[in-house]
């Protein structure tokens, strides 16, 4: 499974690794440059991360906004929890099967996790982070035999991992990758997230083009993220499209090369994505009584575009975590502002209702431990491909007044 990452690390020469015609790609599109002689003991600090000052995260921490009590999930490469920047972070690998990440994928997963929960410079240093390994075959990752399923979705497929993260209690899911997968299992995983109040944040990619169907941001309800710099300007490498909702600083980010132990500079929507996810986590911590829909309303109403207008390049504008923790979301309607995106999107409101009413075929649902089939198809009973409780004819759509 997998495709070229949207990650470029320039050690001696540039190496553009962008989205190709395949299933998954890391969304970083990062350009990494050596930062000079470095040693394993050279821990990365807040002073090395321009976004830390840009978002005034020192002030957020001083006021106790650290993401405490919020559970975030990332679907990415392995996270190296031995990295000194991650010392003391609450990180649990919840991968449902054996995935062995290459060094490249491990670096990417570690970098994304660090933007969230690094002790010194993470946007949410006290959040609980659940990690799920995705296998990128192009990069030399391998998925074990225990990931494979004869009839149905493999355990390391994207819809399977999204549902698994929801099963495990994730409140926010951050996806620093793109995917050309447009199948029903992904649609129903997103429908579940929308109905159960789980926010999914996805990078737009780094091909500098309209990403169209190549990012999870195309789905209804998903917070698509593009990249800006610390002057608020959109970055040329950042992709765009009708799925973009917000924007955040994509670099420069100081990251660690796990092979050389040198620090490098990197850029990409892979870093912008966890900054938006982290901002939502800070708002969730500050406003625990707000609904998920109200937090999404808060995100778009505090975006930095003039009058919070939308465009396909930065959505409603750069994320503003300070404004999000200082603006009471209870003033906004409990309605999902992303239920129908510009130009139309799926799942549609009717499709979301199909999911909540339990009439979606269980063969299209991947590892959703909350799903009950309530439709009328008797063939679903006893079928080995149906692992879900089946209560024929009990859907509320058959019993409405």
Stretches found by the model and what they are:
Residues 61-72, 78-92, 100-152, 220, ...:
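Subtilisin-like serine protease catalytic core
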Residues 1-40:
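Secretory targeting and sorting signals
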Residues 214-285:
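Extracellular S/T/G-rich loop segment that most often corresponds to the catalytic His/Ser-adjacent loop
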Residues 71-75, 128-133, 166, 171-176, ...:
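Structural recognition of the beta-strand scaffold that forms the well-ordered cores
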Residues 138-217, 264-267, 271:
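Substrate-binding/access-modulating region of protease and related hydrolase catalytic domains
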Residues 77-81, 97-99, 121, 135-139, ...:
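Solvent-exposed loop/turn segments at secondary-structure junctions
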Residues 236, 287-400:
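C-terminal subdomain of the subtilisin-like protease fold in secreted/lumenal serine endopeptidases
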Residues 44-72, 95-101, 320:
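N-terminal domain-start motif of subtilase-like serine proteases
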């Amino acid at each position: 499974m997998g495709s070229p990452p949207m990650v470029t690390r320039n050690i001696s020469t540039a190496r553009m690794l962008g989205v190709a015609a395949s299933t998954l790609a890391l969304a970083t599109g990062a350009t990494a440059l050596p930062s000079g002689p470095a040693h394993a003991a050279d821990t990365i600090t807040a002073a090395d991360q321009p976004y830390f000052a840009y978002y005034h995260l020192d002030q957020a921490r001083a006021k106790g906004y650290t993401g405490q009590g919020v559970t975030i999930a990332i679907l990415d490469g392995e996270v190296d929890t031995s990295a000194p920047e991650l010392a003391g972070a609450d990180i649990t690998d919840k991968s449902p099967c054996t995935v062995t990440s290459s060094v490249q994928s491990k670096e990417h997963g570690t970098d994304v996790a660090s933007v969230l929960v690094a002790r010194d410079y993470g946007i949410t240093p006290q959040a609980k982070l659940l990690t799920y390994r995705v296998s990128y075959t192009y990069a030399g990752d391998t998925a074990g035999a225990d990931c494979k399923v004869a009839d149905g979705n493999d355990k390391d497929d994207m819809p399977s991992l999204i549902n698994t993260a929801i099963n495990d209690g994730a409140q926010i899911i951050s996806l620093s990758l793109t995917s050309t997968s447009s199948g029903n299992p992904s649609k129903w995983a997103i429908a579940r997230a929308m109905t159960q109040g789980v926010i999914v944040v996805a990078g737009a990619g780094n091909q500098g083009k309209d990403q169209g169907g190549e990012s999870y941001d195309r789905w209804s309800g998903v917070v698509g993220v593009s990249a800006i710099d610390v002057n608020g300007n959109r970055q040329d490498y950042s992709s765009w499209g009708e799925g973009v909702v917000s924007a955040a600083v994509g670099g420069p980010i100081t990251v660690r090369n796990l092979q050389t132990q040198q620090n490098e500079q990197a850029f990409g929507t892979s870093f912008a994505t966890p900054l938006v996810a982290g901002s939502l986590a800070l708002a969730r911590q500050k406003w625990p009584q707000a609904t998920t829909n109200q937090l999404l309303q808060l995100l778009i109403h505090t975006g930095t575009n003039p009058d919070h207008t939308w465009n396909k390049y930065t959505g409603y504008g750069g994320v503003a975590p300070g404004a999000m923790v200082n603006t009471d979301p209870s003033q906004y309607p409990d309605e999902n502002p992303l239920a129908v995106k510009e130009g139309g999107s799926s799942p549609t409101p009717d499709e979301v209702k199909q999911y909540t009413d339990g009439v979606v075929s269980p063969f299209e649902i991947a590892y959703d431990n909350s799903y009950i089939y309530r439709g009328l198809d008797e063939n679903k009973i006893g079928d080995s491909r149906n692992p879900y409780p089946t209560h024929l004819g009990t859907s509320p759509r058959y019993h409405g007044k």
